[in-house]
């Protein structure tokens, strides 16, 4: 079975580091570096990402409009009904 909790297996060549929660900041440089970096990265890739989304939106709206038109009845087919 397993070993007791105080006598666990030693793991060699594993180094861990820790920092006290009192010595670290929650959001360092969040507004000064984070938001400008997001804007820079967005501007860098917008021309690769936006065209497929725009094309999909146009095809989707066209398809939805065509579907709604195809559900309507043709009034000319019912002119002579009484």
Swiss-Prot record:
Annotated positions of the N6-succinyllysine modification: 33
Subcellular location: Mitochondrion inner membrane
Chain segments annotated as transmembrane: 40-68
Membrane topology, Mitochondrial matrix segments: 2-39
Topology, Mitochondrial intermembrane side: 69-82
Any single biological process term in GO: cerebellar Purkinje cell layer development
Keywords assigned by UniProt, alphabetized: Acetylation, Electron transport, Membrane, Mitochondrion, Mitochondrion inner membrane, Respiratory chain, Transmembrane, Transmembrane helix, Transport
Modified residues (N6-acetyllysine): 33
Membrane topology: Single-pass membrane protein
A Gene Ontology term for the protein's cellular component: mitochondrial inner membrane
InterPro entries in the record: Cyt_bc1_su8, Cyt_bc1_su8_sf
Subunit structure: Component of the ubiquinol-cytochrome c oxidoreductase (cytochrome b-c1 complex, complex III, CIII), a multisubunit enzyme composed of 11 subunits. The complex is composed of 3 respiratory subunits cytochrome b, cytochrome c1 and Rieske protein UQCRFS1, 2 core protein subunits UQCRC1/QCR1 and UQCRC2/QCR2, and 6 low-molecular weight protein subunits UQCRH/QCR6, UQCRB/QCR7, UQCRQ/QCR8, UQCR10/QCR9, UQCR11/QCR10 and subunit 9, the cleavage product of Rieske protein UQCRFS1.
Role: Component of the ubiquinol-cytochrome c oxidoreductase, a multisubunit transmembrane complex that is part of the mitochondrial electron transport chain which drives oxidative phosphorylation.
Family, per entry: Belongs to the UQCRQ/QCR8 family.
Protein name, as recorded: Cytochrome b-c1 complex subunit 8
């Amino acid at each position: 079975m397993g070993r007791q909790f105080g006598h666990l297996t030693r793991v060699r060549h594993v180094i861990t580091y820790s920092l006290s929660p009192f010595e670290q900041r929650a959001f360092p440089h969040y507004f000064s570096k984070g938001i400008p970096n997001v804007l820079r990265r967005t501007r860098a890739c917008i021309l690769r990402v936006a065209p497929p989304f725009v094309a999909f939106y146009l095809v989707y709206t066209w398809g939805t409009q065509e579907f709604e038109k195809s559900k309507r009845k043709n009034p000319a087919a019912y002119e002579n009904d009484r």
